[in-house]
Amino acid sequence: MNLVICVLLLSIWKNNCMTTNQTNGSSTTGDKPVESMQTKLNYLRRNLLILVGIIIMVFVFICFCYLHYNCLSDDASKAGMVKKKGIAAKSSKTSFSEAKTASQCSPETQPMLSTADKSSDSSSPERASAQSSTEKLIRPSSLQKPSIPNSAGKLTRPSYPKRSSKSSCSKKLSKSSHLEKAHKKGSLEKLCKLDYACKLASSDKPVRPPQLFKPLYSSHPQNEISPSKPFGPQELAKPPKHFNPKRSVSLGRAALLSNSELAETCQPYKKKHLVAKTYRPLVNDISEAKEKNTQNLHVSSKVKSSSRSFRKLDSRNNAYGDHVNDSDTMKYYSEVDSDKVIIITCDRGYNQVTSEVTLND
């Protein structure tokens, strides 16, 4: 820019010198007043041009300086903002880390953790094994340690204590629910095994082992007796499918019950077994007849030997004789009394069963 200005100034100075020389030569030849007016006008024009050029150059220079200064100021302000943001981020990080260390080192977190452990232990009081009792004895002794090594151990942990506490709480809740389910299953199995032990004590023949499912009861449970099928010693000796070591203590206690308690609990089963045992062959034959004819017939397992029962049965036979076919009757010869014949007739239309006892002469 300075070079351009110098060149313009030199050109203007040369023109001025040339004009002065021409004016000196012409003054000697022509009229003086006319030449003097023309020279003055030319001189003014040149001076005006020089002033306009100088003004333009100064304006351009000022604009350039202004733009350059604005750009530098914008860059400086941006750099200052970035520095301020970096300083604020560093200060926030340091304050957050200090707060974490203070919260970890504070002794208030120790009783909170101990209360959480105690609540999780109290939420599962149904544990009935030796291992759980030993763990409960060990836990309070471990909680009585000083808080200084605990705080030092917490400082070595990663910077995400909240997530670990949430995961530990979820694990404890899942363990407690699992233990409650296992205790319920163990109580059901205990009841089934008590029934099975009572049946074994009351009967001479092997009995079906207990199963954990609800039996399907019919609409007339009093008139229905299902014969028990014998099982071999191999099937009785099979262990359960799902073995749980936590139930071993409860099952051992159930197995160590005294004979007197078993006898007291098995009295109703003995009565039922005696009734079913006296009429077992009769019930087996009735079940075969039911399979041949229909499955919805209800069979009575007792036959009265009094004269009134004979009269009632004769009247029923006379009343329902029209509805009975030859295929609906069945004869049973008992092993004890060879002179007695038991005839059982099944009525399909009325869903009733009548029986007769006649003597062979």
Swiss-Prot record:
Glycans are attached at residue 24. One of its GO terms (cellular component) is membrane. This is Uncharacterized protein CXorf66. It is found in: Membrane. InterPro entries: CXorf66. Residues 69-361 are cytoplasmic. The gene is CXorf66. It is a single-pass type I membrane protein. Residues 20-47 are extracellular. Keywords: Glycoprotein, Membrane, Signal, Transmembrane, Transmembrane helix. Residues 99-184, 209-247, 295-316 are annotated as: Disordered. Residues 114-133, 299-308 have a biased composition (Low complexity). It comes from the Eukaryota. The chain crosses the membrane at residues 48-68. Its main location: membrane. Residues 99-113, 141-150 have a biased composition (Polar residues). Residues 1-19 form the signal peptide. The keyword Nucleotidyltransferase does not apply.
